[in-house]
């Protein structure tokens, strides 16, 4: 199982390379609420919105529960103590991945910064993605 970041879906839709196709075929893909919302936010029509919604139904989804918000706050605090500021959405995604012990598939370098402090975070690597 890998938690897939928004940028991977966008890359795949814009340029469906063989390496991306193979991961989508071979791996169990998961999303989280942040990724769902970001993808739906990018819809350009009602049809596009419906297609994205249908596509997302194919994947497992992980989200934060009430106690996890304290953990997210702890993670953000620990990052800030090291002088690292990352987008709030990326911190949520990282916290979800850490909670469930699953790697994040991303092309976003913010996750390397997060990983430098939250060393339990695993990043799923594919060619040309970090």
Model-found features: residue ranges?
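General small-molecule cofactor/ligand-binding pocket signal
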Residues: 30, 62, 124
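Acidic, PIN/NYN-like endoribonuclease modules and their adjacent C-terminal/linker elements
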Residues: 1, 16, 98-130
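A secondary-structure boundary/capping signal
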Residues: 5-6, 35, 107
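A generic structural signal for short hydrophobic patches within well-formed alpha-helices
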Residues: 9, 36-39, 111-112
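Short, well-structured N-terminal submotif of metal-dependent ribonuclease cores
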Residues: 1-31, 40-54
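Active-site neighborhoods of divalent-metal-dependent phosphate/nucleic-acid chemistry enzymes
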Residues: 61-109
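Short, hinge-like loop/turn segments at secondary-structure boundaries
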Residues: 46-50, 79-80, 121-125
């Amino acid at each position: 199982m890998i938690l897939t970041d928004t940028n991977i879906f966008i890359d795949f839709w814009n340029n469906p390379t063989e390496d991306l196709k193979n991961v989508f075929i071979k791996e169990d893909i998961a999303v989280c609420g942040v990724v769902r919302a970001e993808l739906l936010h990018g819809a350009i029509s009602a049809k596009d919105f419906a297609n994205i919604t249908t596509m997302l139904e194919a994947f497992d989804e992980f989200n934060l529960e009430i106690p996890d918000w304290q953990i997210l706050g702890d993670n953000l605090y620990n990052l800030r103590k090291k002088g690292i500021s990352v987008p709030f959405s990326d911190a949520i995604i990282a916290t979800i991945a850490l909670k469930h012990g699953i790697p994040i598939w991303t092309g976003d370098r913010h996750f390397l910064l997060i990983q430098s402090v939250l060393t339990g975070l695993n990043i799923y690597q594919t060619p040309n993605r970090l």
